[in-house]
Amino acid sequence: MNKELLNNINKILTTTMGIDRIKKNLNINTDVVEFCKNKILDKNCNIYKQGKNYYCEIDNIIITINSYSFTIITAHIKK
């Protein structure tokens, strides 16, 4: 689990394009940022950093977050 991401959970955001992309990829119609935050905070979420991004894996979903800006880049269902 990555403490830096969890300590900055309130800084997590996304762009308008990110919202559309994530809603489409995950087939959801809810607040994307809150949905992702809830997944990240789940005790079963596997959080790891690779390069400049955090990856959060839970419930067959992968959420990609920029480690500098805490912007959700994308989220998709594992293939």
Q: How would you label these PLM feature ranges?
A:
Residues 1-79:
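Ribonuclease/tRNase effector modules and their secretory precursors
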